[in-house]
């Protein structure tokens, strides 16, 4: 179970899976059916792309980042959101502990928008 804090209220969700290290899908238990399944995008960090990997090393890093993110959410799963949505309509969430762990393991980089650097040498 994942807990998501929005406007001081904690909501419960089930992790359906992660596409890569910074994009996952959650099923909110208390939401109306049209809001129940939400893709979420973690803010403040960027991880390697899994589907659009430009080299083998990026794909390997992306798999590690995805696995770490999934494990984090399955064990600790505390996220925060202000309800805003990103460029592709995903709910923007933050997870400071996850961010720090991914960055310390070199599976993510700090990110605040704009052009991103590549992951291939």
Name every feature range the model reports, one short phrase each:
Residues 1-121:
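Small beta-barrel nucleic-acid-binding modules, primarily SNase/OB-fold domains
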